[in-house]
Curated annotation (Swiss-Prot):
Identification of the protein by name: Uncharacterized protein C29B12.08
Keyword Cytoplasm attributed: yes
Region named Disordered: 121-206, 286-305, 322-414, 552-611
Signal peptide span: none
Provenance organism: Schizosaccharomyces pombe (strain 972 / ATCC 24843)
Main location group: cytoplasm
Example of a GO biological process term: silent mating-type cassette heterochromatin formation
UniProt keyword list: Cytoplasm
InterPro entries xrefs: Clr5_dom
C-alpha cells in the first residue's frame, strides 16, 4: 500500500499545490487521470504523514466539484476557462462540454457550474428566439467548417486517455447542400468582417458542395469525433451573425464602385428609406440625377435619349440579381416573384422597363409640365419621390417639354401607391387605405415635377404648389409652364423666390406655419382701449363696432351684427373681460386683413372665424395666461379643463420656468429670498414639493 502511495507521491504533491484544491477534488482527479483509487480517509492520513496541508473543503454541499471549480484559481482555472470559452464558441451542447471538461480535467462539473463559469467569463448567447428557428442550421454549418481535420486530430491524439464525446453536430455536407439548393445566399450567413472567417467560408455554397465532392475537405476527422477548435480560435472568436434580427436582411455597406453615375447611388438603401412597393430595379433618387447634371438648377435642358434607361442598366448590372432585394415584398403582391432571391434571370431586359406603363422612374422629367389640381388631403401624406414616364415617352424625355399641351394631364402620385397601384387598378382599392389611392383615374400615368426632392413626404407642400396657395386650400387647377424663361425661376434649392411671399426656409415645410407678425392696426387698438374701458362695466363685451372696422376691413364677418348671432363668445370670455388689463399678455393681435400682410397665406386655422373670435384667441384668458408657453396655442382657452388634474399630470403646470413669469403664483422676491431650500424636481411643480 505504502509503495503505491510512494509511486504517486510527486503527482499528488503537484496537484495539491494548485490553489483551490480540496481533498475530495484531489481524490477525483487522481482517480480520473491516473486511475489511482483511494478513500478520502486514506488521503487525509497519507497527506498528514507527508506534512502536506491541503485546504479543507470550503463548501459542504453535494456539488463539491462545482464548488471547487468555482474557487479554482491559478493554472487549473485558467485552463478551464479557456476550454469553456472554446466549447462555447464552438457551440457545443452543455452535455458535450461537460464531458470534454471531465475528460480533460477530471472535474465532473454540474451544468450549473458550467453556466456559472460562462457567466463569469461574460459569454452570453442571445436568448433563443421562436422566430429564428429556420436559421438554426446556419451556425452549425459554419462550425463544422471550423472544426477542421488537423485541429481535432492533433488535440485528440495529444492525450491518449481522453475519450472525447460523440459530437451532436449534423453532417456539414448535408447542411451545405440543402442550403445551396434553397438558394440560401451566403451574404446572410457571414458576418460583416470577413477577416475573422476561415478562408473557405467566403465561397459560394454551390462551389463549397462541389469542392467537397472532389476531395472531402470538410468531413469531420476519421476518428468520428469532432473535438475542440484549437487555440488560435480564441484570439479571434467566431462572429456569429446576429440571429436576433434575422427577418430583416443585413444591409451591406455600399461598395465604392456603385456609388455614382450622375451622382446617383445605385445600391438600394435598407428598409427605412425605401418606400414599400417600389420594385427592385428602381432607384429612389429621382432628383439627384438632375441636380448633378445642372447644379445651378437654372438650365434645365432635356437630356439626350441615351440617359433614358440609365437607372435600369445600372441597377441590373451593378446589383447581383440573386442578392436579396431589401424592400419587403409580401408573397401576395404580384411583383414578388420577379425579385425573389433565387431568380437568376431578371424578368425584364435592360431596355424594356420591368412594369410596362407606370411603375418605375426611367428618367427625370425636366421641368414640370403640369400639376393637376389635387385637394390637399389626398396630396399631403405622400407626395412623390418617383416619376413614371408616360407610355409614349419611351422615345425620349424631350416629348414632355416639346409638347407641353399634350393631351395627357399627369397627376401627382404618392410614393407608395404609384408604382404598383397604377399597374394593377383592381388592387388599388384593397391594399392601400382610401386616402392614399391616387386621386386621378387608375389608368392615368403619374408624373412629378422636376425638383422631386421637395416632395418627399416630410416637406408638406412642394415649392411650386406652395407658391399658389389660395385661401380655399385647394391647388390651382393645372398650372402649366409654357416658356422656358418661367422654368428658370423655379429654383431647385429652397431660397427666397418670388413664389413664396414669406421667403420660407427649409424648416417651415414641416413645422407649423408661423403667422407673419403685424403691428397692431387702428382697429385692434380700438379694441384694446374699449377693453380697458369695459373693466368698469363688467357685463359688456368689447366688440368691433361697425364704425371701427368697416365691411372692407373685415372680409370674414357676415355683417356688422354678426358677433351676437353667429359667433357666440365662449363662456370664458366673461371672466376674461372682468380682470384689469395688466394680466393680459400684450401679444399683437392676429394679422389684420387691412394691412399689407400677403394674402396668399391666410392663417389656416382662423380663416373661417370672425374677427372678435380672433381677439379671443390672441388674448388668452387669465387662467391660461399663467403658463406662458401656452399662449400661442390656438385652443389655449379650451385647455382649462386640465387645471383639474393633479399638477404632476398636468402638462400646463410642469415646466418650472412658468413661475418666474407669473405674478399670480409667487412674487419674484419670494423666489429669490429663500433660494433653493427645498430640492428642485424639474418634473414636479415646485409649489407642491
Amino acid at each position: 500500500m505504502t509503495k503505491e502511495w510512494e509511486c504517486r507521491r510527486e503527482q499528488i504533491i503537484e496537484l495539491s499545490k494548485i490553489n483551490g484544491m480540496t481533498i475530495r477534488e484531489l481524490q477525483a482527479r487522481m482517480s480520473k487521470m491516473y486511475k489511482f483509487d483511494a478513500s478520502i480517509r486514506s488521503y487525509k492520513r497519507v497527506l498528514a504523514r507527508w506534512g502536506i496541508r491541503v485546504h479543507r473543503q470550503r463548501f459542504v454541499s453535494p456539488r463539491t466539484e462545482e464548488a471547487a471549480a468555482r474557487t479554482a484559481s491559478g493554472d487549473v482555472s485558467k485552463a478551464l476557462d479557456e476550454l469553456v470559452t472554446q466549447l462555447f464558441h464552438a457551440r457545443q451542447s452543455d452535455k458535450d462540454s461537460l464531458a470534454q471538461i471531465e475528460a480533460n480535467f477530471g472535474l465532473k462539473l454540474s451544468k450549473r457550474a458550467l453556466h456559472y463559469r460562462r457567466k463569469r467569463l461574460a459569454l452570453k448567447r442571445p436568448p433563443p428566439d421562436s422566430h429564428d428557428s429556420p436559421n438554426n442550421s446556419i451556425p452549425l454549418m459554419a462550425n463544422s467548417c471550423l472544426l477542421s481535420a488537423d485541429n481535432s486530430s492533433s488535440s485528440t491524439t495529444s492525450n491518449p486517455n481522453v475519450a472525447p464525446p460523440i459530437s451532436t453536430l449534423p453532417d456539414p455536407v448535408a447542411t451545405i447542400s440543402s442550403s445551396s439548393s434553397s438558394h440560401l445566399d451566403m451574404g446572410a450567413i457571414h458576418p460583416p468582417h470577413h477577416s475573422s472567417l476561415p478562408p473557405h467560408m467566403g465561397v459560394d455554397p454551390s462551389t463549397m458542395a462541389d469542392a467537397h465532392n472532389a476531395h472531402s475537405s470538410l468531413t469531420p476527422p476519421q476518428s468520428g469525433y469532432s473535438s475542440m477548435p484549437s487555440l488560435p480560435y480564441l484570439q479571434q472568436p467566431f462572429q456569429i451573425p446576429s440571429q436576433r434580427f434575422s427577418r430583416q436582411q443585413q444591409s451591406h455597406p455600399f461598395p465604392a464602385a456603385q456609388h455614382a453615375v450622375n451622382g446617383q447611388p445605385q445600391a438600394l438603401y435598407p428598409f427605412i428609406y425605401q418606400s414599400r412597393n417600389v420594385p427592385m430595379g428602381s432607384t429612389m433618387f429621382a432628383s439627384s440625377n438632375q441636380s448633378a447634371a445642372h447644379p445651378d438648377g437654372n438650365n434645365a435642358l432635356p437630356m439626350d435619349n441615351t440617359h433614358a434607361n440609365i437607372s435600369y442598366m445600372q441597377s441590373s448590372q451593378s446589383m447581383p440579381v440573386n442578392s436579396y432585394s431589401y424592400d419587403r415584398y409580401t408573397p401576395n403582391q404580384p411583383s414578388y416573384l420577379e425579385s425573389k432571391p433565387g431568380n437568376h434571370q431578371p424578368s425584364y431586359t435592360s431596355e424594356q422597363p420591368m412594369y410596362s406603363t407606370a411603375s418605375v422612374p426611367q428618367q427625370i422629367s425636366n421641368g414640370p409640365t403640369a400639376v393637376n389640381g389635387l385637394p390637399m388631403n389626398s396630396y399631403t401624406p405622400h407626395s412623390n419621390h418617383l416619376h413614371s414616364p408616360s407610355p409614349n415617352s419611351n422615345s425620349g424625355p424631350t416629348d414632355s417639354l416639346s409638347a407641353p399641351n399634350s393631351t395627357s394631364s399627369p397627376s401627382m402620385a404618392h410614393a407608395n401607391g404609384a408604382s404598383f397601384a397604377s399597374q394593377y387598378p383592381s388592387l388599388n382599392k384593397s391594399i392601400f387605405p382610401a386616402s392614399y389611392s391616387s386621386s386621378a383615374e387608375d389608368g392615368q400615368n403619374m408624373q412629378a415635377p422636376a425638383h422631386a426632392y421637395m416632395q418627399s413626404s416630410i416637406y408638406g407642400v412642394n415649392q411650386e404648389q406652395k407658391s399658389e396657395y389660395p385661401s380655399n386650400l385647394s391647388m390651382q387647377s393645372s398650372m402649366s409652364i409654357k416658356d422656358p424663361s418661367q422654368l428658370q425661376r423655379i429654383h431647385l434649392y429652397p431660397q427666397h423666390s418670388q413664389y413664396d411671399p414669406n421667403g420660407m426656409t427649409m424648416r417651415d415645410h414641416y413645422s407649423e406655419r408661423i403667422e407673419p407678425e403685424a403691428k397692431p392696426s387702428d382697429e385692434t387698438l380700438t379694441v384694446r382701449s374699449s377693453r380697458d374701458l369695459s373693466v368698469h362695466n363688467v357685463g359688456t363685451l368689447p366688440v368691433l363696432s361697425a364704425a371701427a372696422a368697416t365691411q372692407a376691413a373685415m372680409p370674414h364677418t357676415m355683417g356688422p351684427s354678426a358677433h351676437d348671432s353667429a359667433s357666440a363668445p365662449s363662456p370664458h370670455m366673461q371672466s376674461q373681460q372682468a380682470l384689469p388689463y395688466q394680466y393680459y399678455n400684450p401679444l399683437p393681435a392676429m394679422a389684420d386683413p387691412a394691412q399689407n400682410v400677403p394674402q396668399q397665406l391666410p392663417p389656416p386655422i382662423h380663416s373661417h372665424l370672425s374677427d372678435d373670435q380672433h381677439i379671443q384667441y390672441s388674448y388668452p384668458n387669465t387662467f391660461v395666461n399663467r403658463f406662458p408657453q401656452n399662449i400661442h396655442h390656438p385652443s389655449a382657452n379650451l385647455l382649462d379643463a386640465s387645471a383639474a388634474l393633479n399638477p404632476v399630470q398636468n402638462p400646463l403646470l410642469m415646466p418650472q420656468q412658468n413661475h418666474e413669469h407669473s405674478p399670480l403664483v409667487r412674487s419674484d422676491a419670494a423666489l429669490h429670498d429663500h433660494g433653493p431650500l427645498l430640492p428642485v424636481y424639474p418634473d414636479v411643480d415646485s409649489r407642491f414639493v
